[in-house]
Each structure stands twice: as C-alpha cells, then as structure tokens.
Amino acid sequence: MLNWFTKFNYLMSNILIIKHGSLGDIVQISGVLQDIRETQQGNKIFILTTIQYVDLLSRCPFVDAVLIDKRLPRWNLAYLYKLKKLIKKYNFVKVYDLQNSSRTSFYRKFLFNIANWSSTSTTLKKGTNKKDFDQNSVLERFKIQLENSDVKTKNVLNPNFSWACINVDKIVNKYFGKKFILIFPFSSPKLTHKQWPYYNELITIIKTKHPNLEIAMAPSPNEIEDAKKINAVSITNFNKSLNIMELAGLIKKSSFVVSNDTGPAHMSAHLGKDGLVLFGYHTTPKKVSIETDKFKALSVDDLKNLTAQNVYEKIKNKLELIN
C-alpha cells in the first residue's frame, strides 16, 4: 500500500520549460514562470537553460529543478544523444518552449518526442499571420502563447525579478554610505552600437547639480578595464565582478538607474526601479517590453547625437526627489 508521500509523488507530473538567451531574456520570463507555476500546482517544473543561469534559476521560487543545455552544434551526435537521454529520464508530459528558436524546434521534431509542446508555432491560432504576430512585444507574444496553452496570465506582462536579489549591504558599505545612482555604460562586445558615448559628461553634470548623490557602476569581467575610463565608483566583490544575484541586490538598493539597452536595464525595469534606458536605431522599447510606470526609455536615431544635457533634462526631476 502506498503511503501519502509516495502517492503524492506518484500523482505528480514533470513539466519542462526551455529558455536559453541573454540575461535580459531570462529576467523577462519571471512573470511567465510565475503563471506556469500557478497553473501547474502539484506538478514538478524543470527548466532547461545554459550553464551561466544555473545558480540564478536554482533560487527561482517558480521552478523546482534546473537542467543544463550546453547548446553544442547539432552535428555533435554524441551530445544530442546524451541530451535526449537526460530528457527521456524525466518522462515530461508537457513542454513550454519559451525560446521559440530553430534549435528548440529541432528538439521538438527530432529529439525529445514529447507531444504536448507549447511554442509560438504550435499555439498560433488558425488564421493568425506569423508576421503580424511577431510585431507584438516580447511579453505580449508570451501572453498569447500561454493563453493558447490554457495558462492564466496574471503576471506575464508585469515580471517581478525581486526573487533574484540578495543583500549587498556589506559590499556597498565598503564604498559609500549615501544614496547612489547606478549607471550601466557598456553593452555586449558584439553590440557596441547600443553604447551611448557621453556618460562622463552626464556624471559631471549630476555631480555638479546633486553633490549629495554618489554615482556607481558594476562592471562585468570584460568591462573592468574600460570601467577605469568612467568617472564613477566601480563596485566589485573582492575585486571580482558581482554575480547576477548580487547585481540584482545592488540595483534594488540604488535610487535611480541610467543604462544602455542591456541585461541590467531589464533587471532594473523588473525590479521596480526608477530609471532611464537609452535606445538608438537597433530596436524599440515597446518591442523588447522594457518600459514600466517607473522605468522609461529615451529613443533617438543616433546615440552619438544625444547630448548629456538632453539626458539630464529627462532625469533631473527624479534626481531632485532623492533625499
């Protein structure tokens, strides 16, 4: 005879979520994960992701376990076989494909053999044009995918990333004790067109007008050298870049954020921070679902033509409210 605990486990089903992508992509699915969790109560939720997000997603309250996809080339048959074995082991009854890529489409068709698969291609309603669908913002597309998969969408449009934060008081107190503005003046090395070139000029204006505010940044490992050229405090933890959870805690503790269109900008938006993100021609704030009631975007055709004074005019009222 089965005891209660054994019965409970016997009745549970395993659910798989797939999400690779950039830091901003991971941040944005917080509401999606929460909605899936609330729909799949009583079932065990796994997420398949890349190794750099394992520590982060291991603390996410909406998933139970994290699986690693090394995303090796598809001609690496030994790796594909190993991945197939890993997935088969858990006998997943449902997949939510949040990556919606050619790679995950390949997994669905040739590798995982799981019939109940939610992706944009499998859930798009008859008569809906894919090109029109793709004009929606990132979060709107997720909302449609979830609704067409019988998931109640209460949180998808308003992701809350606060679960990622850890306390960073000991780190920050080594640098200063007053309120601070956080800047993110860099971007991925491959996306330098996203970088606004006048952060030092903006810093000079802010320090002149608001001497009560400190200005800080948190460079990633490949930004530490470039950060020496910026007139702001570089926050590290024992001379190492902050991890994602520490960075989330630092953003949460800040009074205002100014950023290029990067992962930390998405973190700031979905941690409920006041801030401004700067956009050039590469995309629109609506397309990437970054604006909130507090976190706003300033878009221009060419970031090189956006002056420091223009940016300051957009944020000065908010800075004046910081005691």
Where are these regions (language model features)?
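Catalytic machinery of carbohydrate-active enzymes
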Residues: 1-323
